[in-house]
Amino acid sequence: MNRINMSQEIQQLRRLIFDELSKIVDPEIGVSIVELELIDKVDIKDGNVDIDLHLTSPFCPAIFGFKIAQDVRDNVYKIHGLDKVKIKVSNHFMADAITKQVNESKLPEK
C-alpha cells in the first residue's frame, strides 16, 4: 500500500475513532468526553491504537474514571481494522490502577 493510501486509511480510522469517542459521556457531567477535550492523544499504527486521556478532576470517583476508560477501549476496539487498543489514563489519583485494570480486562466481541 502506498503512502497516500495509508495516510487516507489512518485519517478514516481517526474519524471513526472520534465518532465512537463522541458517544461516550462523562457520567458526572453528562457531556461527551470529546466535547470536554479529555482525549490527549490518539496514535494509530499497524492496526494498533494508543489513546491517552485525562479525567475531569484528579479526584473524581474512580468508578467513573474506570467506566470512561473502559468505554473508550471497548468502543474503539469494535472498529473494523483495529487489532489492539491500549489506554493510558492521567491526571487522576488512581490513574495507574485504572490504566492497568482497563488494559487487562476482557475485550468485547467484535
Predicted regions and their residues:
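Domain-level signature for proteins that mediate thiol-based redox and metal-cofactor handling
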Residues: 1-110
